[in-house]
Amino acid sequence: METLRKSIIIALALTTLTFTAFSQDYKGIQNAFEKSYLYEYSGDYPKAIDELKEVYDETSYEVNLRLGWLTYMAGFFTESAAYYQKAIDLKPLSIEAKFGFTYPASALGNWEQVKNSYKEILKIDPQNSSANYKLGSIYYGNEDFTTALKYFEKIVNLYPFDYDGLLMYAWTNLKLGKFREAEVLFNKVLMNRPSDKSAIEGLGLIK
């Protein structure tokens, strides 16, 4: 009985120490995050990065995500992409990490990686308006208007009076020679934003 009592006391002591350690770790990480925000607000990204590197844990999604953003803002694009990728590896369904990855990937000119990131987001959330819009814009910029059309069409189906979606859907229809559809859409844009220069320009190309 005495042996059992001692075992229970030791187990409780170890549990208390474990919880205390976790509490101390969280406090240290929270302090590092707080300081990183203060440095970020003042524009001192290197110091914000240093604060988090002091408590860096490669298994922490939050720390990797935050460092991905800070290193991107500091202009360390390759390092930023690596942190975001680590966050994605830790949380494969994270949409925010995938969006984050597109920032340094875009800055580095890795457009295939950017497109793949948006496609991965749409596998998880097919109705994501931001991913649909940005992916459509990439295809539009590459003059792949047929592919761009399906992404803008989805946005307009979800948000029929959204300015950005309507405008790009109108221009894409125009580029594909669908003048009647484009005319209707440009006029809807003008209901949303009267005197919109882009919509007026588009209508001028039809008439």
Language-model features, listed with the residues they occupy:
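Alpha-helical segment of the N-proximal tetratricopeptide repeat
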Residues: G28-D57, E62, R66-M73, Y103-S106
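Helix-start (N-cap) detector for alpha-helical repeat units in TPR-like alpha-solenoids
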Residues: I29, Y61-V63, I95-E96, S129-S130, ...
